[in-house]
């Protein structure tokens, strides 16, 4: 192990590697902050460039895009209530309320530190414990994936802002959106309403832009210039910096969320969005300030960002040890490895251990450099909130439409985003929350596909979910999650009643 580390460090420590990391991070952060563009797109665009590069700088360029894109999604989630990437969807829950309170710098700084913490944690786990974790995740099949998704859906209870019925209905709407298009098992079309272009379904990024950005612009149609002037006067950035006491308070949350993110990321087919929601729910249930969650609680930002960035390292675990990509980005990285003459899988640690350890050490460096770059640019991001509302609205519209169009070069996708935005605006007026819908969209396909595959495995017997230890564990966690929600709700009502008496 020590020899591999020293050899990998020597191979990685070159000017070409550091330049590749720096360029990858900067480009990734910018692309991740544009709603509609994701790290997947950035990696695909840069893949041909890496063909003529040495293996380590080539892979570090792509990993810089991956990590930078994951972190960059939090910037727009916090500033304009629109997650730049699907994994940052949960960050809007507390990030944007902090901006509304005149504390964008505090939220952005916490997102940066949490992203660094989670990313570094998972990079170190990848470096020192990849084979052990890979052996553990090999025991997961369709029943386990289904139960993980059910556990994720149980979170709807705690993010429904006191109205669990509307939260559940929102979750069902999200699942319906996820099921539009081609059946992933049989291949038949469903819920397309005669529109052939819906056969491919609605891309997640289109749904995100519609539900958040377009709906937010519509909800501000009663814009008042005086209100905007007052808002700008209250944004005193010099007096809202993140304190050491607040960072210290979030350390426990970041640690637990990083563990959750690392485990979830190591399970193929899950990803940062699921990890972020699970971590947010866990943080809310265990925090002393759980009543502040959803209203601008810094712990909420630390939970979601440390979790989704913790998946960046752990998604590489099944890729490097078994040749199985953990998410969309690592599926592209699989092709990048093969372009460099390396085939990910069990033999990779034997045949290319020096290069592999160089890449893993480089991932640690990527997260450290991301912290440095973020510290330089975060104050500049925060000043975006000072832009006049009329100009900001125009920028957001152009930003989002360009991002959605660029993702698939389709005006139909732009039209879908506008329709979803109008629908989301109507739901907001009726008192529905957006986040339960997003959770349903993220988990809908995972629930359906793995449930049906589990039924095939068991001969249509539901007993498969309670006879396998890990599936039973996640089902128990789902029941416990719902039970804790109702218990704490009853406890809070009793406390309020006592105070009134």
Features from the language model and the residues they span:
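Helix-loop-helix hairpins and the membrane-proximal interhelical loops
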Residues: 1-58, 131, 137-138, 189-297, ...
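Transmembrane alpha-helix interface/packing and boundary motifs in multi-pass membrane proteins
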Residues: 25-39, 68-81, 156-161, 258-270, ...
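Re-entrant/interfacial helical elements at transmembrane boundaries that shape
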Residues: 39-48, 62, 77-97, 128, ...
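A structural-propensity feature for long, helix-poor, extended segments
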Residues: 66-77, 84, 297-322, 326, ...
């Amino acid at each position: 192990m020590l020899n591999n580390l020293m050899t990998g460090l020597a191979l990685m420590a070159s000017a070409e590697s550091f330049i590749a990391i720096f360029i990858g991070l900067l480009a990734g952060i910018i692309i991740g902050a544009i709603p509609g563009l994701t790290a997947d797109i950035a990696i695909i665009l840069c893949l041909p460039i890496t063909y003529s590069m040495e293996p380590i700088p080539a892979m570090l360029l792509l990993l810089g895009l991956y990590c930078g894109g994951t972190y960059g999604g939090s910037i727009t989630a916090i500033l304009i209530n629109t997650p730049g990437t699907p994994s940052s969807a949960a960050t809007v829950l507390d990030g944007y309320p902090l901006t509304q309170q005149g504390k964008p710098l505090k939220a952005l700084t916490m997102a940066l530190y949490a992203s660094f913490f989670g990313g570094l944690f998972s990079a170190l786990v990848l470096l020192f414990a990849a084979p052990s974790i890979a052996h553990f995740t090999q025991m997961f099949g369709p029943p386990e994936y289904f139960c993980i998704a059910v556990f994720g859906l149980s979170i709807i209870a705690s993010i429904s802002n006191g109205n669990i019925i509307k939260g559940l209905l929102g979750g069902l709407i999200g699942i319906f959106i996820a099921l539009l298009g081609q059946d992933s098992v049989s291949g038949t079309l469903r819920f397309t309403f005669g529109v052939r272009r819906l056969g491919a379904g609605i891309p997640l990024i289109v749904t995100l832009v519609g539900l958040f950005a377009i709906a937010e612009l519509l909800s501000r149609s009663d814009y008042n210039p005086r209100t905007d002037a007052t808002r700008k006067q209250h944004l005193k950035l010099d007096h809202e910096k993140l304190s050491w006491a607040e960072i210290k308070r979030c350390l426990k949350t970041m640690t637990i969320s990083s563990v959750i993110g690392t485990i979830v990321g190591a399970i193929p087919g899950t990803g940062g969005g699921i990890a972020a929601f699970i971590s947010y729910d866990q943080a809310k249930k265990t925090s002393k300030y759980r009543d502040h969650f959803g209203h601008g609680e810094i712990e909420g930002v630390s939970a979601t960002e440390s979790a989704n960035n913790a998946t960046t390292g752990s998604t590489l675990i099944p890729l490097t040890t078994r040749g199985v990509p953990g998410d969309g980005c690592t599926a592209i990285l699989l092709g990048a490895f093969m372009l460099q003459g390396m085939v990910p899988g069990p033999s990779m640690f034997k045949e290319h251990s020096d290069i592999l350890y160089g890449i893993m050490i480089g991932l640690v460096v990527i997260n450290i450099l991301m912290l440095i770059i973020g510290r330089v640019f975060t104050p500049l991001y925060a000043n975006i909130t000072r832009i006049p509302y009329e100009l900001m609205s125009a920028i957001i519209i152009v930003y989002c439409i360009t991002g959605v169009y660029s993702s698939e070069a389709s005006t139909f996708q732009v039209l879908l985003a506008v329709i979803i935005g109008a629908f989301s605006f109507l739901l907001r007026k009726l008192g529905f929350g957006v986040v339960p819908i997003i959770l349903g969209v993220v988990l809908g396909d995972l629930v359906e596909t793995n449930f049906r595959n589990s039924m095939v495995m068991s001969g249509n017997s539901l007993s498969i979910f309670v006879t396998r230890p890990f599936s039973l564990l996640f089902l128990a966690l789902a029941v416990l999650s719902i039970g804790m929600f109702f218990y704490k709700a009853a406890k809070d009502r009793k406390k309020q009643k006592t105070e009134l008496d």
